[in-house]
Amino acid sequence: MATVNQLVRKPRARKVAKSNVPALEACPQKRGVCTRVYTTTPKKPNSALRKVCRVRLTNGFEVTSYIGGEGHNLQEHSVILIRGGRVRDLPGVRYHTVRGALDCSGVKDRKQARSKYGVKRPKA
């Protein structure tokens, strides 16, 4: 236990919280250009071909972003919006592509959870 005199001379150091999404720089989303669109395989118990893209952001960061939903229209030089949110079974993927924003289209024929995949309400 520090004495009062020690604390007067050198106060207690505050713990600095480290961000899980440093490339966003405290913004809710960031815009970027796809430099590579590819598939990758997940970690051990799971098996699939996950769709991801490498993105060069407007602030100069280059990050890997997951493309959620069934099917996408992204290719190299597509301009996309990314948000935070990691993919647990893909190491190094800490961002998600926002569907239905900029060049990334919404998921075709999506009926449920539409807002997460950028789909307008269907005409009844």
Swiss-Prot record:
The modification 3-methylthioaspartic acid is found at D89. Keywords: Acetylation, Methylation, Ribonucleoprotein, Ribosomal protein, RNA-binding, rRNA-binding, tRNA-binding. It holds the Pfam family Ribosom_S12_S23. GO terms for molecular function: rRNA binding; structural constituent of ribosome; tRNA binding. PROSITE patterns: RIBOSOMAL_S12. The modification N6-acetyllysine is found at K108. The keyword rRNA-binding applies. GO terms for cellular component: small ribosomal subunit. GO terms for biological process: translation. With S4 and S5 plays an important role in translational accuracy. Belongs to the universal ribosomal protein uS12 family. This is Small ribosomal subunit protein uS12.
